[in-house]
Curated annotation (Swiss-Prot):
This is Uracil phosphoribosyltransferase. Its cofactor is Mg(2+). Signal peptide: none annotated. GO terms for biological process: UMP salvage; uracil salvage. The gene is upp. Pathway: Pyrimidine metabolism; UMP biosynthesis via salvage pathway; UMP from uracil: step 1/1. Belongs to the UPRTase family. CDD domains: PRTases_typeI. 5-phospho-alpha-D-ribose 1-diphosphate binds at residues 79, 104, 131-139, 200. The lineage of its organism: Bacteria, Bacillati, Bacillota, Bacilli, Bacillales. Its EC number is 2.4.2.9. The keyword Nucleotide-binding applies.
Amino acid sequence: MSKVYVFDHPLIQHKLTYIRDKHTGTKEFRELVEEVATLMAFEITRDLPLQEVDIETPVSKAKAKVIAGKKLGIIPILRAGIGMVDGILKLIPAAKVGHIGLYRDPETLKPVEYYVKLPTDVEERDFIVVDPMLATGGSAVEAIHALKKRGAKNIKFMCLIAAPEGVEAVQQAHPDVDIYIAALDEKLNDHGYIVPGLGDAGDRLFGTK
């Protein structure tokens, strides 16, 4: 079974409070989401492998460490996931960015791919799938499936707020994918919104309704 990591860092929790607040405007909301994504990226990359290299400082030769292993790819789930990408790229500027778009089938109510654009070297990368919300888990499950069937092996899922139902859905469908969240909320309401949540992340990011 995959692991669930809840980041309780004071800066993350402080900024998340204002992200939740319904009085926070679009500009500030967008900036806060980006900032929290940066802080979460710092934590999620804590286990990246290192290798020793030889360098020369202005004073002497030295042994130093650089990141080793596979390169990273960031995959936002459209459209709200886009709001987290720049924050991650501030720490990992060389990461490649793909996109996965999903729509809900009106009859089955299940997510269906409508757009998938990934780096050409999928099998050579480790991926972080990002979406501000993990509600029912349907979109996350399908996005991860889309990556796997195209050759991705090592995938992590990162979101700001999750409901227990969404976490369970991802764990059952993808027990090899660890989940990283800023807050685990109480439940989903009858309309599928996370409670207390933050509302519709996409609308709040882009100023739409």
